Amino acid sequence: MTQVVPGIAPHGGQLIQRIATAAERQEFLAQADHLPRVQLDERALSDLVMIAIGGFSPLNGFMGQTDYESVVDDMRLANGLPWSVPITLSVTEEVAEPLKEGGWVRLDDAQGRFVGVLELTQKYRYNKVHEATNVYRTDEEQHPGVAVVYAQGPINLAGPIWLLQRDAHPLFPSYQIDPIASRQQFADRGWKTVVGFQTRNPIHRAHEYIIKCALETVDGLFLHPLVGATKSDDIPADVRMRCYEIMLEHYFPQDRVILAINPSAMRYAGPREAIFHALIRKNYGCTHFIVGRDHAGVGNYYGTYDAQHLFDEFKPEELGILPMKFEHAFYCTRTQAMASTKTSPSSPEERIHLSGTKVRELLRKGELPPPEFSRPEVAAELIRAMRSDSEVAAV
């Protein structure tokens, strides 16, 4: 099902909607006990939701072999449309064997609840090492994204989906804004240009600097932190959300920012994921997307500006969303302000470089991030959360 929506065209031209109506849901529920079952892990469940709400438009289901191979090899769907990350439902041979192409498959969450259905059009094998090498640029299992690929089943199930059940987010129900709603909110505020910002870290001073630089040139900011599956050492989503709320309350104009959660899972695919994140924000209605240093990177697998360079391999009209590329920002001790090499007269010795990794290292040591790293209210919240977790662990 597609729908006419306000704002820029979604990727592929139509905002996909695969949420079952009440009548459709009842029809599927009546068949529940007779359908073969596949249990979804956290990432597959978030992918199901993102497909259903249109966040992954133009996808209406999990990728078939032709699309999958085209994306892995060429960063395009089989029809030529740019798409950089495969969206697949991988299962074991034991799960796949009894499933019949052309039939319906019941999709359950981890609690065994019937949350969706898959119209199974294809079952196919895939090369895990080839996917890892092409998508993640490494075959090392130490890479968290590669580890997921290696751990999942060897058979992909493909076909359109329907979402039957979706709970409000247990922690952030008020920030659960789907693409059709975000687009309407942008229109209601009169925003013609909107910049999206992807983050899985608390906003430190370098983030704040580049966000405000971007906000100088557009009508509004869509702050869209990822709350799906991340690495175990990433700062928990509830802590990060409190930090975002603090930043918006004290340091941003309230009428020019919308905060919403991104329910998709982090893949740590670096440059390819930067393209993926931009296309998602396009579907949410953003016209621009911030791409900073080492976007969606992990460890030393990607170059500092590889993600920015990858955007240059596509024609702007193909992507349909403009990347706003920023250099690594730092705190300049000479001017006592945030800057980049484009705006600072300082020497390297006068620059304090900031990163989410450094903030996490300080927190693990029980140290308060300095004001050059984080706003004091944010630093206080981070250290409070860290101490609270330590107290719980000690019980």
UniProtKB/Swiss-Prot annotation:
This protein's UniProt keywords: ATP-binding, Nucleotide-binding, Nucleotidyltransferase, Transferase
Domain of life of the native organism: Bacteria
Record flagged with keyword Metal-binding: no
InterPro entries xrefs: ATP-Sase_PUA-like_dom, PUA-like_sf, Rossmann-like_a/b/a_fold, SO4_adenylyltransferase_pro, Sulfurylase_cat_dom, Sulphate_adenylyltransferase
Residue ranges the record marks as coiled coil: none
Family the entry assigns: Belongs to the sulfate adenylyltransferase family.
PANTHER family reported for this sequence: PTHR43509, SULFATE ADENYLYLTRANSFERASE
Protein name: Sulfate adenylyltransferase
